[in-house]
């Protein structure tokens, strides 16, 4: 899901055929396929920008809780703590943490769009068109059409990792049902292979 899905998607693309010995299939939920477009969406006026600022603040708070581990290091913590957006936080902290020159290099490396053709196991992605991290117009639909291994199921609504159903959504969510059906379809009758 979300960032974990970005990591898994990149792993699947990077290791291509070699993954077949380790995984039979994968499902990605609410993945930001294009980190540049996702960031652009989060910087739009209104709720997206509010969410962006809130999440940047959460990231800052998590660093403040362990700041003693970062003092006298490569970071200008006051500059990091003044970040108002996720992109600013990434530029000031994440890039330095992982050795990227800037957010553009980091986002180019992180995006899955442009790498789907390298994935060699069945993958189902579930995304909502109203996901502020991965809006419908940023989904790699054309690239997916050319892949024998990758499919994207989109819903009009669901937000980011939402997919709730009903007036009081206390039962399984839509994403739970899709995962269950997908897993059953992949593994039914194939357990002897494990």
Regions found by a protein language model. Give the residues of each.
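Short helix/loop capping segments that flank catalytic or ligand/cofactor-binding pockets
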Residues: 36-37, 134-135, 162-163
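Conserved loop-alpha-helix segment in the C-terminal half of the alpha/beta-hydrolase fold
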Residues: 129, 133-150
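Catalytic active-site module of serine/aspartate enzymes centered on a nucleophile-bearing elbow/loop
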Residues: 156-194
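Active-site nucleophile elbow and catalytic-triad environment of alpha/beta-hydrolase enzymes
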Residues: 92-115
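Hydrophobic/aromatic beta-strand patches that form the interior of the parallel beta-sheet core
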Residues: 27-29, 124-126, 153
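Short beta-strand/loop motif that positions the catalytic acidic residue
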Residues: 119, 125-127, 131
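Alpha/beta-hydrolase-fold enzymes
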Residues: 1-97
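Short, conserved loop/helix-junction motifs that constitute active-site signature segments
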Residues: 20-21, 116-120, 143-147
